[in-house]
Amino acid sequence: MQFPNQAAAINPGLMASVFGLGCAAMLLEFTKMNGAGNDFILFDNRDRKISLTTAQIVHLCHRQRGIGADGIMGLVPCDSGKADWSWQFHNSDGSSAEMCGNGARCFARYIQKLTGATGDLTFETAAGVIRARFNGDRVTVGLTKPHGLRLNEAVALQQGPTEIHSLNTGVPHAIVYVDDADKAMVAGVGAEVRHHAHFKPRGTNVNFVQVKGPDFIRVRTYERGVEGETLACGTGVTAAALISARLRGFTPPVKVQVQGGDLLEVSFREENGEFTDVALTGPADFAFTGSVSV
C-alpha cells in the first residue's frame, strides 16, 4: 500500500528495542496522518488479529520513545451492520474515546485510500454512525446529534468564579471565552477544569475561545486523554461554534482557526432550539507509513 509522501519504513528491530518489547510477536504496519495538526496512527485490523495493550498504545503514541501521536485508530468490520466500517479508537494515554472529529476525517481518508472506496462512506463509533464525504483534499464528516447543552454556569476555579458553557458533540466539551487566545492559560486552567468536580465522573475537554469576527473564532483545546494541549480538536471546535451560535448569534458556516494554524469549518441547522445536521470540514493529510514490532 503506497501513500503520498511515504517515508522509509521504521526498522522493526530498532523499534522493538526502543519500546522495550523484546522479541517481536507481530509486525504492525501503520500509517501516520494528521487532521489540522491533530495527529494519529492508523492501522488495518479488518482480520482482527491485532490487539494492543494499554502499555503498547502509550508506547506507540509517545513522542520521544515511539512514533508519536495524539491517538491511534484501527479499522475493523462493522458488526452491527449500521455502517460500512467501524473503528477502534484510543487516546495517547490508552483510554478509549467515543468520538474524535479530526480523527474521523483522517479515518475516512484512510479507508478511501486503503479500500479504493468512491463516494460517501460510513463508519460506526461509540458516539454513533459517522458519514464522510470528500471534496479534493478536504473531508466533511457529519457528526452525531449534540446533547447536554449547559450555558452560563459559574464554576469555582483558583482564579475565581469562571463562566463556563458545555456541550457534548460526541465527547464532552467545556467552553471558556477569552479576550486573547494567545494569553489563555491552557495548561493550568485547562487541567483544572478538565478534572473539576463539576464535570465528574469522566471529566471534560476544555476549549478556550476567542471571537475574531463575525462567524469566526479561534480555539485552543486542552484534550482529555491526551492530558495537554493539541494543535486542533474537531469536536471541540464544533462545540465552540455551536455555543457561539447560541450565545453570539453566529450563523453557519462558522470558521474556526485552531492552534496549528489551519481553518476548519462547522455547518449546522437549528430546529426547535436544537442543533441538527452538524458537520465538520477540514484537511486530512498523510505523513508517512512504517512498520513496528509489537
Give the positions of each predicted feature.
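Internal active-site segments that recognize and position negatively charged phosphoryl groups
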Residues: A156-M185
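Intrinsically disordered, low-complexity segments enriched in serine/proline and basic residues
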Residues: P4-I10, L14-S17
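Active-site glycine-rich loop that binds ribose-phosphate moieties when present
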Residues: K145-I164, A191
